[in-house]
Amino acid sequence: MTDSHKRIRKNCICISILLLAGAGLALYLVLSGYEPSGGDIWGHLYKSQEMYESLKKGNVFPLFSPYWYNGIQLFRYWGPLSYYIMAGLMFLTGGDLLLAYRLLAFVIFVVGGLPWILWGIHENRRVLGTFFGLLWFFMPEHIRIYFTAGNLPQMVTTMLVPYAIWFLWLYVRKKNNCAAVGLFVCMTLMSFTHLMVTAIMGVSAFLYLLIDQIWNKDTRRKIFALIYMICGILTAGIWVIPSLKGGLVTSESGDGSVMSTLIYPLTTSLNPFKRLSAGNDSFYFGLAAVLIAIAGILLARGGKKAGFVFLLIMLACTTPAAYRILVKLPFSQLFWMTRFAPMIYGFFFSACLEWVRLKKKYCVLLAALLCVDSISCMNLDFYSVATSDETKMEMQQLTKLTDQRTAVIDKSSYGSYPSYGISGSSHTMYTYGWAWQGAATGDNIVLLNEALDRKYYRFLFDRAVELGADTVLIRKSDLEKQDITISDIEQDAAASGYSMVQEMTTAYTYKRETPENFGTVTGYYGLAIGKYANEMTLLYPAFVAGSSDVIEDYSVEELSRYDTLFLTGFEYRNQSKAEAILTDVAAAGTRVVIDSTHVPANKSNKQEMFLGVFAQQIHFDERYPVLSYQNSEIRSDDFAEEDRDFSTAYITGTDTEIGTFQMGNQKLTFLGMKDDLPNVYFLGLNLMYEAVSRKDAALVDILNDVLGISNEQLPDRELVPITIAYKEDGLSIDVDADFDQETGVNTSIAAQDIFTSDQELSEQMNLLVVHERHTEISFVYPMFVPGIIITISGFICFILCICMDVRDRRKHIV
């Protein structure tokens, strides 16, 4: 047997070991009946099923699904590649979603482990490369991502990261120009999988190359490598550009509170016992990797140390001390440090493979340390986050009661299962879903959850009607936490036509008798405009929040349709024009109430003044002073604990003092009017905020009087039967009753920027309003032209860089 044949035989043995191990893992999951596990997994499995069913119909990229969040663009904000992979596995399994999930472990295990074997073959370190290939899937954070978090796109990126690192190493260290193509393709595929992780991969590569430059001076190739990676991301522009407009990416980008939850002290991230005691979702990085990295820094040759140094630096960045610095950096939203773990592991493995002078006996010790550290990760049952049979049964019962759509008001306490159990297995429409940040009705969902938290059930049931939900589920545990009983909310449910029809083990189900499919025609009594408008509607459901915070975005005619206008945290572009609009609205008979605590500062004099009334800062401790209102003394409750040190504002400049309070020897005004503005009220002291926060009855009585609308009042809602037909490329809506075409019918379908129609469309509270008896709507790919331009530009830039790279390389050789 020749040396060449021997090498091929060894290579085949290494790859066969990987395939057998992957098959063993998948076989274990299949034979044990391993349930899909992880906090997010059922939401991702639902999207996988949607992709599979769309592909069966010949629709390669479904633009719209009606089942979650009153309608959502499922694959606009979540990269589609992982769902294509799952759909492919479902084709192999004859549509068996659970079997496809179990086979996915084989795919990720083998595909993710293969680069390390190829690396070992390249460096003639087959045993170590094979060991790393087998271990990659079982690294602590990878197991957590797969079985505890259940984040399918992240699971797929863990198998792409090794390829990106391998091609980066081949291009920079081995001067292999062909590797640039692999690097480019890897970044494109990662972009189509999880955009934020792709950005983190780019940041990791930059930091690694920066560290490596200390020992290996090759600025040119490193810059070119980063350019190729950027070109790969740009080439995915056809999907990336639409995904950046709103939705999940934007929400994640600004969420520093989430970033702070992904920070752990070293006593947690390096303590193998704490993970076992603290729970399966605790972040454990791996003590063995850190010990080996320290040894590598001390003993390896300088040119091989970058991966070890990178590990220690990035691990330090996961600590609370580093968070205080990271949060102040530009693009700090990228520094979700635990998401760097696959990249840290990858560069660490690469450093170990580069450490060619490490003797075999020490390689065995290295492998033993990593094995011992990861052995607990092989107990898959420990990481399992399973769904209870009780939850599955209750979702089945709920769907049987539902005609059009259901709302499960559970604050995600059921986990992600309802997103599949309601919409996936029974194809019932669902007001909620999973990962609300990608939903057009995201604000509506937040308000429903706020209403539950603050016990505003009157608002909750009313808005459930608006969202088209004929059934509403409320968990018993939420009522118990609030120390209220079902009888306490019966009146609020009945006010919107709901009655309790089924008591389940853990929840109550409310039902309203409705047409099979219905929309609503609604008459709101009041309009709230400004930053805090949504919050006030919790207490005053007869008000609707305006679509803009800017006064000039409304016409006098539009505002005059309402009985009362409440302004809180509003804005204007031109103060004089805004004041003129409100003056005309008041003259037309609409009551205008201005929350003077939140008046914009005048651009010229920086004073908080509007319509000649000024807001003057004041400070209270514990509670408001005694308030004088209509010859009565009002004593309010104490402030909430977090508001005990309360800064607010009283008002000056009014002609008529309606509400006052005494501060020392001064009588100050909190409610007043001007003689030349007989229908305009100026309100101070942030009374609305306190009334909403604490349901202070004394303050609510004042506000009811000032607004001219009771907090018990609901909007006038008329249910209108409609017929909706969904197609792959659009939908049609028929209104089966007479209605005022100017007002239109709220269809309860989430309004989308991909809807186009020859008939008039509008939106109210993020929901689609139609104005004709028959409406045909087509779906158009969002931002197609700018997306395709970026894609073509990225590919052209890549080709140009390749040509420049090859040309410069040839010049160097000559």
Name each model-derived stretch:
Residues 347, 695-710:
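Short amphipathic C-terminal alpha-helix that caps PH/PH-like domains
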Residues 343, 356, 406, 472, ...:
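Hydrophobic, well-ordered secondary-structure elements that form the walls
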Residues 1-386, 390-395, 453-458, 467-477, ...:
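Membrane-embedded transmembrane-helix bundle of lipid-linked glycan/lipid transferases
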Residues 467-468, 654, 674-679, 727-730, ...:
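Short, solvent-exposed coil/turn segments at beta-strand boundaries
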Residues 191, 201-203, 237, 319, ...:
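Active-site proximal loops enriched in glycine and acidic residues that flank catalytic Cys/His/Asp
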